[in-house]
Amino acid sequence: SNLPRLDSTTVFQSANSIWIHDKSPVKDSFQQINRQYFLAEIQNLDFSEPKSTGIINRWAKEQTQGRIPHILDQAQGNCILINTLFFKGGWIFPFDPAETRQENFYPVSGKKHPVSMMHLSDQWFAFHKAELFEMATLPYGNDSYAMTVILPKKGVSIDSCIATFSEANWKAWLSASDSISCMLDLKLPSIKLDYKSNIIPIFQKMGIHDAFNANCADFSRMTDMPAYISEIEQFTRLEVTETGTVAAAATITNVVFESEIVSEITPY
């Protein structure tokens, strides 16, 4: 709740919603907690009606300022939980559009791609040289928000850099960069990209398994019926230009309720 108030010149918005299929038995206490603490919008819909999918997609589109217009082909399950994030910030030190040129960019594949390369010279930025990479911090607005750009050293892969990321290391790197400023000649591609991913494997790598297993999941605070998470998808949009950055994300979680299984092993 404090993040949107950090900078009046930068937009940061978070929204939550819960969509309940028809009369699926979601506990009132669960709904009340989400309304009170997460400011969630909660609606009952008939997922079998095509208009329900449209209603949910429009909500996501509105909350992401049109950046993520479509997150569902067909509403499924018994309960859909959605979180959205939207960010729009202007650089403290904007790039001059007149300095933007078509140049080659070399992604992980090594195959060159022509891009619009932005250029900013003779400007001071927080900077740090780690063992495997260099990092520079580009601030927005009143300096409450910033983008940290990481450039692997020659011969070092992105994956090798990511493997060193931990909370402790990240704090140490940021602290080191805050204490050192460096005048940089900075080149950064103008970016507009969309990304969609099933993020259940990420949770599983973190040790979370039961929530996705119909035989083990415990959602008794949500419903008295057996329930499990069938799907978590995340949609993201990132736009980086000479003036600043727009970023949006929508994460959708499908929860399926199952009927109690009654085994009749004696005459009935």
Where are these regions (language model features)?
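Long, His/Glu/Asp-enriched segments that create or flank divalent metal/ion-associated functional microenvironments
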Residues: 266
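Non-catalytic, conformational "gating/processing" segments within enzyme and secreted inhibitor domains
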Residues: 2-160, 175-262
